[in-house]
Amino acid sequence: MNPHNVKYLAKILCLKAEIQKNPYAVISKDVVHRYSTDIRYGDLTTIISVRHKTSTSNTVFQVFNESSVNYTPVDNDYGYPIIITSFLQTGHNKFPISFLYIDVVASDVFPKFARLSPTDVATVYSVLQIGDTKDALKLPRMLETEISAKILFHKDFPLKIVRFFKNNMVTGEEISDRSLVAVLE
């Protein structure tokens, strides 16, 4: 973990703070501009404070290397330690160092995505139903280890389907839904 990795991680944590504030928010790289960050870098523990610019809500994230997790909640704490790992692992709070080599959020390929509301989930499942039979079409799947699933985690709202938005010059905005699949360890 170095200061550059932590700066890139702070942008991802801004997106997680937006989901804590509004679980059904549409996440894109523009969301980062709504937040300011205060990073207190340390070799073993880094404290990242994420403050919303207009509502002044503050969320504090404690970041640890996977070998030295010493977590105790503080004021305005996120509720979970953020752990930098060597490899891709399950868990919404575990980010592999490979995610942090570049500024993923600022990338042109960073997706625009959102969690579906319960009524939207029911609508999607009803559309996938084949007639009156018990058979149903399946959505494309995504692993819970993908960064979009890690960002969309909220303890009170389980994530079932992620909706991705893609701009199309001809048809406007296209949507594609993907169902979340748990990774077996």
Curated annotation (Swiss-Prot):
Cited InterPro entries: RNA_Pol_22kDa_poxvir
GO CC terms of this entry: DNA-directed RNA polymerase complex; virion component
Entry EC no(s): 2.7.7.6
Keywords noted in UniProt: DNA-directed RNA polymerase, Nucleotidyltransferase, Transcription, Transferase, Virion
One term of GO molecular function: DNA binding
Listed GO biological process terms: viral transcription
Family annotation (Pfam families): Pox_RNA_Pol_22
Protein origin, superkingdom: Viruses
Top enzyme category: transferase
Subcellular location: Virion
Catalysis performed (reactions): RNA(n) + a ribonucleoside 5'-triphosphate = RNA(n+1) + diphosphate
Sequence similarity: Belongs to the poxviridae DNA-directed RNA polymerase 22 kDa subunit family.
Subunit organization: The DNA-dependent RNA polymerase used for intermediate and late genes expression consists of eight subunits Rpo30/OPG66, Rpo7/OPG90, Rpo22/OPG103, Rpo147/OPG105, Rpo18/OPG119, Rpo19/OPG131, Rpo132/OPG151 and Rpo35/OPG156. The same holoenzyme, with the addition of the transcription-specificity factor OPG109, is used for early gene expression.
Role noted for this protein: Part of the DNA-dependent RNA polymerase which catalyzes the transcription of viral DNA into RNA using the four ribonucleoside triphosphates as substrates. Responsible for the transcription of early, intermediate and late genes. DNA-dependent RNA polymerase associates with the early transcription factor (ETF), itself composed of OPG118 and OPG133, thereby allowing the early genes transcription. Late transcription, and probably also intermediate transcription, require newly synthesized RNA polymerase.
Protein name per UniProt: DNA-directed RNA polymerase 21 kDa subunit
Lineage: Viruses, Varidnaviria, Bamfordvirae, Nucleocytoviricota, Pokkesviricetes
UniProt gene name: OPG103
